[in-house]
């Protein structure tokens, strides 16, 4: 879950600002529905688990996250803001339930005197997942981005490429268009990989986790 959140949050943040040309404040506001979903369902995760069972809550949350990540595939170069807000909110519901239940299960599986250590391990895993998501998914997206240059002089990142294009005047328009398309292709590839991984996780949880 944290791999998906860390990696895709970074990529979609770049998408909003560099592809859709939104400023930082507007991009942050676009992310509020997801943040609210995470907060609300983190608080309500225990009630969800009590209603449907812990295993079903876990599996359902991972499925929702996978649906949200799959929705990133609908985002295009020229539009995608509303679809972004819709699908990241869906993913946020899944993230909220997952994060709360993971901590609860980890702490609840050890004696009370070891709950502090268990909680620390859980937090460390969250941080590690975020770092892995940024590294692996970011690298995958960058690989696809650079591969989509078709001989054009792309810089290492989309932002650097756009700045280079700005200095070329009218002749840089084609470079801007190609760079944005290549970045979206990279983001889509990362989203597809994330969706596939989450789907596998959901299936495994459904079979190996106790109700």
Predicted ranges, named:
Residues 23, 143-195:
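A membrane-interface helix-boundary motif in multi-pass transporters
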């Amino acid at each position: 879950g944290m791999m998906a959140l860390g990696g895709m949050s970074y990529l979609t943040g770049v998408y909003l600002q560099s592809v859709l040309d939104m400023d930082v404040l507007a991009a942050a506001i676009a992310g509020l529905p997801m943040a609210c979903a995470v907060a609300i369902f983190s608080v309500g995760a225990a009630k969800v688990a009590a209603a449907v069972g812990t295993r079903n809550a876990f599996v359902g949350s991972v499925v929702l996250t996978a649906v949200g990540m799959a929705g990133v595939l609908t985002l295009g170069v020229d539009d995608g803001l509303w679809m972004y807000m819709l699908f990241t909110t869906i993913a946020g519901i899944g993230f909220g339930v997952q994060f709360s239940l993971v901590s609860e299960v980890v702490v609840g599986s050890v004696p009370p005197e070891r709950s502090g250590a268990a909680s620390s391990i859980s937090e460390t895993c969250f941080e590690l997942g975020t770092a892995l998501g940024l590294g692996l998914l970011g690298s995958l997206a960058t690989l696809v981005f650079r591969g989509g240059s078709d001989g054009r002089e792309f810089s290492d990142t989309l932002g650097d490429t756009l700045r280079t294009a700005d200095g070329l005047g009218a002749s840089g328009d084609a470079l801007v268009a190609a760079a944005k398309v290549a970045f979206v292709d990279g983001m889509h590839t990362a989203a597809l990989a994330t969706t596939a991984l989450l789907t596998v996780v959901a299936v495994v949880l459904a079979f190996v986790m106790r109700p």
